[in-house]
C-alpha cells in the first residue's frame, strides 16, 4: 500500500521539494494525484508565456519583502488608519505599473474605505479582487510577521489575505515586464472591510459592484481551502434570520387549555423542528439557530449576538427570540428555503403567533458554466506551467467572500487563488511561501490568456 501524503506533500513533491504539514487540515490524505515534473510541461508555453513565468521568479524575493511589510501593518477592520496604510503600500506599486488609483472614502458605511485601481486598455475588462483588512485589531497580541523557516511564515492576515494581495500585484508586474500589461484592461478593487462589512451593505459594496459592470471575468485572491491544487468557483451565501414567537402568559398549570394555549416556547420549538424536518437534507443548504432567548421578558441587542431572558418555571412563556444564519448555494435555493421557512412560521399552535425576518447579507455565487470555463483555463495554465491539476473546492468548505457580490454581474468568476497555508483567523495563521510564485504564475498566465483569447476572437 502506497504511503498517503498530505496535499502539500504531494503537490510539493511534484515540484521536487518537501514539506511537513503543520495542521490536521494539511494532513488530509489524498493519494490519487499523479506526480508531474515542471520540465515535462513548460514546453507547452509560448515564448511570451515563458517570459511571464520568468518575471515572477525574478521578483519573488521582492514580493516576499512586500508581504512582510504589509503583514507588519495592523489593519484590523476597525483600525481605519492601518487599513489606509496597507492601501498606500499597494497604491504606489500599482501606479508604477500605469494604474490610476483612487481611495473610496468609507464614511458613508462607517469603515475606512476601499482602494480602486484602473488600467484602461484595448482588451476585455477583467476585475481583480482583494481586501486590505484582517480580523486582528490593534488589541490582538498577534501583530508581527515571523519567518519560521525558509518556506514557512506566520503572521496576522498573511493568507487572509495579504498574501493574495501580493500575488495579485506581482502577477500584474510579471505581465508588465513581459510587455503585455499595456494591452490589457484591468480594474483592481481592494476592499477595506471584508472581515467586518460596513453598513448599509449596499453602500459598502458599491465600489465593487460598480467596478464589476462590463467585466468579462473576475479573479478573487482569497486563500481558498488550504490546498494549492484547488480553486473556488462557487460560494454559499451568508445571511441571517430572526424568529419571534409570542404566547399567552398564564400559570403553568393551565398550559394547553384552550384559553391559554401552548406558549411561546412550544411555538418556537415547533417551528425549529419543522425547519429541520423539511430542509435539513437539502444539499448545500444550512441554517443554524445560534441564539435562543425565551421567557416572560426577553431583551436582545440589534446584532443578535447577545441578550437576556427572565421567566419562571411556573409561568407560560410569553416571548421567544431566535437568531440564526442561513447559507445557500444559489439565489434560487435561497428563495425556496425562505419560502418554506415562512410557510412553516405562518401556521401556529393555539394562542400563539410568530414572525420571521431575513437579512440576505452576502449573496451566493453559484457554480455557473462560465465559472467552470474559467476554472478550466486556470487548470490548463497550471498544467502547462508544470504545476499540476487544479480542481474546484466543495462549496460546503468555501465561506462567504466579497467575490460573491459580483456573481450575476460578471459571467466568469474564480476565487481562492491566493497564498496557501492554514489556521487563518487564528494566532497560528501560517503561509507556505513556496506557493507564492506558484499562484502568481498561474494568475498571470490566465490573465494573459484571457486577453489573448479575446483578441483572437475579434473580427
Predicted regions and their residues:
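Acidic/histidine-rich catalytic neighborhood of metal-dependent amide-processing enzymes
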Residues: 161-236, 294-304, 455-458
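Acidic/His- and Gly-rich active-site-bordering loop/insert found
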Residues: 43-156, 176-183
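Metal-dependent amide/peptide-bond hydrolase catalytic core
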Residues: 40-47, 75-76, 223-224, 233, ...
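Short beta-strand segments
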Residues: 129-130, 189-191, 219-222, 246, ...
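Extracytoplasmic/secreted envelope proteins and their assembly/folding machinery
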Residues: 64-68, 87, 91, 169, ...
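Active-site metal-coordination/substrate-binding segment of hydrolases
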Residues: 123-190, 196, 210-213, 427, ...
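Bacterial N-terminal signal peptides
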Residues: 23-34
